[in-house]
Structure formats: C-alpha cells, structure tokens
C-alpha cells in the first residue's frame, strides 16, 4: 500500500482511535494523496488534494497552472514525457521535509525513469491542501563540455 510505503519516507503518523489505527494529520494525508494522484495519473485524486488557491509552476509551461487547469496540464505532462520514453515511474531522492507553522514543505530531487528528465521540486501543503508546487529541470547534456 502506498501510504504504508510513504510512512517509511518520514510521513508523520499519529495514533487515531481506540482501536489503535494510525492516521496521518491532514496536511500529511493530503500530500500523500497528491503524490498518489501523480503516480496514478488520477486527476480526481490530484484535484481533491489541492487547495482552492493552488499554483503549479513548471518552466516548460507558458504560465502557472491552477487548480482548474491541473487536469489538462497532467495530460500534457504525460504526453510530453511519454515522447521521451517515460512510463510515469518516478525516482525521488534527497527528500527534505519541514513542518512549520501549519505548512508542510517538501523538497526533493526527481527523476523520470527511462529518460534523462530530472530536476528539483518544492511542494507546500496546508491543512486545506497542496497550495504550491514548483519544479525545475536539470539538463546534463548542456552542462557537459
């Protein structure tokens, strides 16, 4: 189960009800759902994890993506990356997490398996959802001499 896997990545868990089931705090749960939405290319799951003022900043896009335009962006992203040979399998590493003043901030290095596509991402989540993501791209070819 993905949530079980995510707990090993530093997702905060707290004891819930008397049965001892573990539940995540709201912003951690919404962040986990957001990740699932991307892994599964599930627009409904993705939208349900974002706040009303959500902004996604991808330098490959002419303007920032908002909550309303996120499903169309996800389709463009999938088409773009499949042209590069991707199958939507992600490798995330060098993850750093900070939970401060009600905002969960995640930084991570991302790589899209089967491609040279990689970069950094910062994602910010409140208890009403993911409200900001910015990605950058790293190009090994242009940095080699």
What are these regions (language model features)?
Residues 20, 55-65, 80:
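A short gly/proline-enriched turn/hairpin at secondary-structure junctions
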Residues 32-36:
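Amphipathic alpha-helical repeat scaffolds
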Residues 40-57:
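Short, well-ordered alpha-helical segments enriched in acidic and aromatic residues
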Residues 2, 6, 11-13, 20, ...:
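A beta-strand edge to alpha-helix "cap/lid" segment located at domain peripheries
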Residues 25-28:
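Amphipathic alpha-helical repeat elements characteristic of tetratricopeptide repeat
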């Amino acid at each position: 189960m993905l949530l079980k896997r995510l707990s090993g990545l530093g997702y905060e868990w707290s004891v819930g009800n008397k049965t001892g089931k573990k539940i995540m705090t709201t912003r951690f749960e919404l962040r986990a759902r957001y990740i699932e939405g991307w892994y599964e290319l599930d627009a409904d799951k993705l939208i349900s994890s974002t706040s009303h003022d959500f902004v996604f900043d991808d330098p490959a896009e002419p303007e920032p993506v908002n909550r309303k335009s996120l499903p169309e962006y996800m389709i463009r992203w999938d088409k773009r990356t499949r042209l590069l040979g991707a199958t939507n399998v992600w490798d995330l590493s060098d993850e750093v997490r900070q939970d401060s003043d009600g905002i969960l901030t995640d930084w991570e290095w991302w790589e899209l398996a089967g491609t040279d596509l990689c970069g950094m991402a910062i994602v910010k989540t409140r208890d009403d959802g993911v409200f900001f993501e910015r990605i950058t791209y790293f190009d090994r070819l242009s940095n080699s001499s």
